[in-house]
């Protein structure tokens, strides 16, 4: 079952101080929230001096609240000419405010200050109140806020980050004991960089004992606004306390050069995310144009999954869906707009039992209306202005996207940092010193770089020489109906099949799902199958249709893994793992040897639009040693090495293989 979020209640004391009715405590001192944030957390962690001349600086906070600590830190960073290149701020919040309550609370706190504009930017970017990680970017991506909605006790151990500073904030230990427990401090210690600092308003004995036990050295300093003392200090364990160190930047990341092989939505998303961090990327595509294979379809549908148990696929599609929306809005704001629908998308149930499952999933998540709405049969009929057999889910921000236009926009955003090599086929990869060489069929070097990201779908397995990854091709044929043959719905609708209205009045319907069929020819039987599906889904949508052999269509191939999850991240050194199979029989993902600088972003199946941006951000974060945009469990669920790990654990691999 998902952890339903309970939003914070906006309430004030008579003196104007913001208070939490649930905890019976104030959010900040009556002497001023921003002044308190600057004294306790910014200065308490030796900032801004400690981030100066750094490429990246990461702060982890235990309670976001009104965001005043983030706003104060952002202002200090902006005012510092020697600031770090990228500031990461990771903050956990069990009871986030709604967007409008956050705007009111933060505006009240920063009234009559220069931070007011930042409040609007924060509120405008505020995500729907659903569990998980939400990555927001400000100041052209140089300030990155990762909000972690959920209980700190449960969420902190799932985070992957190397923290330079900790803001230990939250209601008093007597009011919220869980947030100050030893388990929380141990989770923070696992993320601490050497000599990472911390600061906290509290100086209670409970906090001091937990700090000491987790390996933090503390000292008392003057508190804020007459408070006698607060605590500051650093991570200084007396002995080694962790099996795995928090992640660092990849050793050769300083070169900031990469090859991306495959120019569909997966590869172009990687290009954009690396270029945004200052990487120079060579994009290699075997076709004349980018987005020529599955990404060349006229449109693709875009929506999350919802399940009652909120399983890995649901959480991953939710994270990908929301992150993609944030990235696409940033592209549009930067002048790189592309074609996408804006009236939501309806996922119709296929039966009464299917609708009951949708209702259970919706109720379990407690989804807010800006994320999903449950429509009964009458409501779905009214929304689509068409007869329907069952209700479904409305995703207000779901819809359809033209993948090729998105890929173009991502490459345009990368600007001069991307060099395109089209009509270029990579026959094999070869490691020479610290660089990978992409070679043609004659052994000539096409391009070289320390990092390669394989985003070329089914061919990635061959190029990487992976023996423990099996991808299956799935043929998908779509059909284009002329405007006279249908009355297009106001938004895309999906179920067992889909119907997407295009701008020219054409109706896109599809698609067939034919595993292990690699026939590229359009078939009349495929058109007939698509028509039958959509007629069941939306009776009355389709009228008279021309002869099937005259209909236009397109065939593309989706590549899927056995568990239907993508493969994203560093590729395993399978030869070394096999040679050490016995020692690695109980291995975790972090124990496995990896191919230096070789990453994958493939196997997206029919969910490339949902997963591509998130996958690209994960790879870029891994390369640069930044906080990951998803929890470790989700990253391990998409790790390309997961099948090898399972084989090792089952002792199905030996050095003789």
From Swiss-Prot:
Catalytic activity: 5-aminomethyl-2-thiouridine(34) in tRNA + S-adenosyl-L-methionine = 5-methylaminomethyl-2-thiouridine(34) in tRNA + S-adenosyl-L-homocysteine + H(+)
Cofactor field: FAD
Protein location: Cytoplasm
Coiled coil: none
Region (FAD-dependent cmnm(5)s(2)U34 oxidoreductase): 261-657
Transmembrane helix keyword on record: no
Keyword Methyltransferase assigned: yes
Keywords per UniProt: Cytoplasm, FAD, Flavoprotein, Methyltransferase, Multifunctional enzyme, Oxidoreductase, S-adenosyl-L-methionine, Transferase, tRNA processing
Region tRNA (mnm(5)s(2)U34)-methyltransferase, residue ranges: 1-236
The enzyme's E.C. designation: 2.1.1.61, 1.5.-.-
Stated role: Catalyzes the last two steps in the biosynthesis of 5-methylaminomethyl-2-thiouridine (mnm(5)s(2)U) at the wobble position (U34) in tRNA. Catalyzes the FAD-dependent demodification of cmnm(5)s(2)U34 to nm(5)s(2)U34, followed by the transfer of a methyl group from S-adenosyl-L-methionine to nm(5)s(2)U34, to form mnm(5)s(2)U34.
Annotated family: In the N-terminal section; belongs to the methyltransferase superfamily. tRNA (mnm(5)s(2)U34)-methyltransferase family. In the C-terminal section; belongs to the DAO family.
Protein name as annotated: tRNA 5-methylaminomethyl-2-thiouridine biosynthesis bifunctional protein MnmC
Gene that this polypeptide is encoded by: mnmC
């Amino acid at each position: 079952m998902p952890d339903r979020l309970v939003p914070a209640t906006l309430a004030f004391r008579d003196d104007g101080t913001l208070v939490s009715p649930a905890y019976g405590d104030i959010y900040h001192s009556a002497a001023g929230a921003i002044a308190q944030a600057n004294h306790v957390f910014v200065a308490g962690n030796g900032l801004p001096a400690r981030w100066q001349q750094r490429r990246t600086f990461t702060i982890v906070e235990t309670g976001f609240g009104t965001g005043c600590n983030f706003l104060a830190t952002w202002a200090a960073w902006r005012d510092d000419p020697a600031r770090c290149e990228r500031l990461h701020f990771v903050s956990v919040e069990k009871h986030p405010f709604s967007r409008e309550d956050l705007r009111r609370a933060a505006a009240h706190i920063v009234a009559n200050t220069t931070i007011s504009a930042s409040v609007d930017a924060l509120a405008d970017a505020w995500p729907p109140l659903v569990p998980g990680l939400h990555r927001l970017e400000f100041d052209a991506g140089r300030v990155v806020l990762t909000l972690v909605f959920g209980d700190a006790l449960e969420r902190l151990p799932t985070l992957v980050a190397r923290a330079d500073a900790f803001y230990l904030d939250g209601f008093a230990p007597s009011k919220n004991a869980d947030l100050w427990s030893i388990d929380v401090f141990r989770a923070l210690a696992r993320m601490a960089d050497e000599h990472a600092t911390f600061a906290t308003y509290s100086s209670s004995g409970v906090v001091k004992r937990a700090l000491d036990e987790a390996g933090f050295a503390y000292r008392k300093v003057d508190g804020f606004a007459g408070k006698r003392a607060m605590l500051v200090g650093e991570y200084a364990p007396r002995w080694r306390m962790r099996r795995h160190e928090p992640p660092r930047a990849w050793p050769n990341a300083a070169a900031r050069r990469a090859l991306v092989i495959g120019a569909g939505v997966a590869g172009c998303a990687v290009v954009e995310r690396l270029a945004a961090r200052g990487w120079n990327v060579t994009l290699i595509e075997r076709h004349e144009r980018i987005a020529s294979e599955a990404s060349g379809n006229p449109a693709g549908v875009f929506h999350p999954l919802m399940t009652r148990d909120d399983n890995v696929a649901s959480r991953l599609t939710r994270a990908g869906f929301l992150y993609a929306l944030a990235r696409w809005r940033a592209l549009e704001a930067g002048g790189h707009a592309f074609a996408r629908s804006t009236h939501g998308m309806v996922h119709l149930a296929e039966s009464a039992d299917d609708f009951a499952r949708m209702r259970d999933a919706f109720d379990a998540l407690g989804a807010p209306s800006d994320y999903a709405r449950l429509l009964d049969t009458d409501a779905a009929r009214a929304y689509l202005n068409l007869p329907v057999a069952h209700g479904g889910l409305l995703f207000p921000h779901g819809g359809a996207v033209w993948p090729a236009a998105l890929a173009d926009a991502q490459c345009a955003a990368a600007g001069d940092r991307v060099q395109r090599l089209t009509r270029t086929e990579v026959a094999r990869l070869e490691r020479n010193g610290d660089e990978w060489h992409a070679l043609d069929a004659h052994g000539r070097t096409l391009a070289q770089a320390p990092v390669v990201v394989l985003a070329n779908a089914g061919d990635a397995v061959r190029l990487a020489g992976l023996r423990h990854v099996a991808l299956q091709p799935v043929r998908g044929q779509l059909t284009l109906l002329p405007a006279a043959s249908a009355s297009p719905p106001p938004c895309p609708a999906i179920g067992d099949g889909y119907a997407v209205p295009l701008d020219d009045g054409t109706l896109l319907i599809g698609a067939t799902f034919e595993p292990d069929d690699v026939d590229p020819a359009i078939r009349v039987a495929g058109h007939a199958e698509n028509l039958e599906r959509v007629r069941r889904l939306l009776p009355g949508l389709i009228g008279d249709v021309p002869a099937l052999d005259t209909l236009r269509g397109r065939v593309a191939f989706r590549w899927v893994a056995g568990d239907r999850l993508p493969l994203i991240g560093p590729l395993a050194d399978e030869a070394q793992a096999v040679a050490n199979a016995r020692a690695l029989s109980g291995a975790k993902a972090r124990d496995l040897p990896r191919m230096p600088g070789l990453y994958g972003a493939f196997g997206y199946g029919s969910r490339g639009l949902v997963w591509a941006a998130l996958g690209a951000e994960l790879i870029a974060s891994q390369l640069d040693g930044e906080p990951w945009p998803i929890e470790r469990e989700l990253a391990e669920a998409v790790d390309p090495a997961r099948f090898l790990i399972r084989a090792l654990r089952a002792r199905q691999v030996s050095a003789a293989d």
